[in-house]
C-alpha cells in the first residue's frame, strides 16, 4: 500500500503514569529524545488494539498460528541473513534440505537435476517462475529464427489468477492472455486454452487452488492438451503450476491427483510455505524440474564455504528465520503429521459448508472437499432483502473477517462469500462461528434494509 499525507492526529497521547507523560510524542517525525523500552512497547501495542483478531480472520490464506517451540526458534534466528551463505552455512544447508524435501513431495524425476530456492512468498516465486519461462522462450525462439520483437510475448492463464501474475506481466512487459471462466468452467477451460497459444507464448499457468473459489485447474488435462500441441510444432509450450495454496496440501490429502512433476510438460512449480506449509508469513518456494528449464543468465553466484553457490532471487537481504521455521515443521510433523493436520482442516471446512447449506439460503460453489475453502452465493430465490455484503459486515461486528466479492470478468454479476479454513480453526471455533453466522442471518432477517437498489458491487474484506 502506498502512503502519503498523514491524518489529522499529529501526536500520540502520552503514556499514562510514565515519565513521558509531560510531553507529546510526534507520530510522523522522530522525537528529539529517546523513550524507555517499556513505554515504546506500550505505545505500539496500544496502536494495534483495535485491529481484528488474526485467528478470526477467515479471509486470509496465511498461517496465523505456530507452536511455541517454532516461534521461539524463529525469534532466536531473526538476525540471520538468508543471503549470507558463507556466514551461515548451516542455515544454507537447511534451505537445501527443504528444497530436496519439496522436490520429493512433488515427484521430481530422479534422472533429472531439479533446482529450487526459497522466496519471501509465492508472489516472488511466481515472478521467478515467469522470468524463467520468458528467458527460456526467448532462447528457444531465437534459435528457431522467430522475430522476437515482432510482438510482445504472452502468458496464458485463467481469469481466476492471483494479482501477482498481472504484476508479472506488467513489470516484465508480457501480454496476459486470459481464458475466461464461466458458470460451466469455474476453473481453466482446457477445451479453449489452445485458442490462446501461439509461437509467442512463454508458457501456460495452471492454478492449484484458485484464490476466488479454492478450485483446482485440471493440470492433467492441460498437460494432455499441450502434449498434443507440442507434438505438432517446434515452438514448445510448457506449464508453470501456481500451487501457492495447493502445493503443501494436495500431496498429503489427495495424493492421487496428478498435477506435479509427474506430468511431462510441468516444468516449474511455486508454493507458499506460509499457507498450508504452516509457517508464519512470509516464505515461499519455487522449483524447476531440471536445470535446463532455468536459464543460466538468471543465476547468480554467491560465496559459500570458499566456493560459490548459485542463487536466484529478486529480493536480497532477508531473515532466514522463516526458512528455519519451514524446516522445523518438516522435521516436527513429517508426512503423517501434515496429512493429519490437513485432513482435520478439510473436515472442518466440510462441516462449515454443510452448516451453511443447511440454512437454505445459499448455493455452495466449493464445499471444502478439495482445498479447505468454503465458497457460496445467495440463492436466486432466497427472497431476502440483505446481501452478502451485509452478512460480512454483521459478522465483522462479531469479530469475524469474512470477504464478499464478485467473481472475475465474465462472472462479475455473481457475488460470493468465502471462508479459508486453516490449521488453527478447530471444530470448537467452527461451531462458535456457525452460531454467530446463524445469529447474524436472524438479525438481518429482522432488520429494516435500505438502499440496496442502488448499491454497487464491490469487495468487502481482503480476498487474497
Curated annotation (Swiss-Prot):
Keywords: Decarboxylase, Lyase, Pyridoxal phosphate. Its cofactor is pyridoxal 5'-phosphate. It holds the Pfam family Pyridoxal_deC. One of its GO terms (cellular component) is cytosol. Belongs to the group II decarboxylase family. PANTHER family: GLUTAMATE DECARBOXYLASE. This is Glutamate decarboxylase beta. It comes from Listeria innocua serovar 6a (strain ATCC BAA-680 / CLIP 11262).
Amino acid at each position: 500500500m502506498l502512503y502519503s499525507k498523514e491524518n489529522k492526529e499529529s501526536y500520540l497521547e502520552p503514556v499514562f503514569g510514565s515519565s513521558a507523560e509531560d510531553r507529546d510524542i510526534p507520530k510522523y517525525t522522530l522525537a528529539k529524545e529517546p523513550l524507555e523500552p517499556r513505554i515504546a512497547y506500550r505505545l505500539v501495542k496500544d496502536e494495534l488494539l483495535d485491529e481484528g483478531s488474526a485467528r478470526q480472520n477467515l479471509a486470509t490464506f496465511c498461517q496465523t498460528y505456530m507452536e511455541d517451540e517454532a516461534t521461539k526458534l524463529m525469534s532466536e534466528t531473526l538476525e540471520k541473513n538468508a543471503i549470507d551463505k558463507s556466514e551461515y552455512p548451516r542455515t544454507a544447508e537447511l534451505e537445501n534440505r527443504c528444497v530436496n524435501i519439496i522436490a520429493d513431495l512433488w515427484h521430481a524425476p530422479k534422472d533429472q537435476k531439479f533446482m529450487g530456492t526459497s522466496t519471501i512468498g509465492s508472489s516472488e516465486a511466481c515472478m521467478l517462475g515467469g522470468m524463467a519461462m520468458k528467458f527460456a522462450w526467448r532462447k528457444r525462439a531465437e534459435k528457431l529464427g522467430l522475430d522476437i520483437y515482432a510482438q510482445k510475448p504472452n502468458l496464458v492463464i485463467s481469469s481466476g489468477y492471483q494479482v501477482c501474475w498481472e504484476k508479472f506481466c506488467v513489470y516484465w512487459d508480457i501480454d496476459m492472455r486470459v481464458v475466461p471462466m464461466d458458470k460451466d468452467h469455474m476453473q481453466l477451460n482446457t477445451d479453449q486454452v489452445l485458442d490462446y497459444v501461439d509461437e509467442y507464448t512463454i508458457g501456460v499457468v495452471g492454478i492449484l487452488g484458485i484464490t476466488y473459489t479454492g478450485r483446482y485447474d485440471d493440470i492433467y488435462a492441460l498437460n494432455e492438451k499441450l502434449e498434443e500441441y507440442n507434438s505438432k510444432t517446434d515452438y514448445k509450450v510448457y506449464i508453470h503450476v501456481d500451487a501457492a495454496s495447493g502445493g503443501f496440501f494436495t500431496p498429503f490429502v489427495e495424493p492421487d491427483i496428478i498435477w506435479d512433476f509427474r506430468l511431462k510438460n510441468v516444468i516449474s512449480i511455486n508454493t507458499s510455505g506460509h499457507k498450508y506449509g504452516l509457517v508464519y508469513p512470509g516464505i515461499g518456494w519455487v522449483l524447476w524440474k531440471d536445470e535446463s528449464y532455468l536459464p543460466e543468465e538468471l543465476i547468480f553466484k554467491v560465496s559459500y564455504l570458499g566456493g560459490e553457490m548459485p542463487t536466484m532471487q529478486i529480493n536480497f537481504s532477508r531473515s532466514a528465520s522463516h526458512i528455519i521455521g519451514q524446516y522445523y515443521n518438516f522435521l516436527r510433523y513429517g508426512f503423517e503429521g501434515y496429512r493429519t493436520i490437513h485432513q482435520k482442516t478439510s473436515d472442518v471446512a466440510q462441516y462449515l459448508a454443510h452448516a451453511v447449506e443447511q440454512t437454505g439460503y445459499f448455493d455452495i460453489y466449493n464445499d471444502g472437499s478439495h482445498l479447505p475453502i468454503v465458497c457460496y452465493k445467495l440463492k436466486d430465490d432466497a427472497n431476502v432483502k440483505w446481501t452478502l455484503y451485509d452478512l460480512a459486515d454483521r459478522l465483522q461486528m462479531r469479530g469475524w473477517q469474512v470477504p464478499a466479492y464478485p467473481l472475475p470478468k465474465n462472472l462479475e454479476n455473481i457475488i460470493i462469500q468465502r471462508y479459508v479454513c486453516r490449521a488453527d480453526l478447530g471444530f470448537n471455533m467452527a461451531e462458535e462461528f456457525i452460531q454467530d453466522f446463524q445469529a447474524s442471518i436472524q438479525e438481518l432477517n429482522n432488520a429494516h434494509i435500505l438502499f440496496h437498489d442502488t448499491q454497487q458491487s464491490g469487495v468487502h474484506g481482503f480476498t487474497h
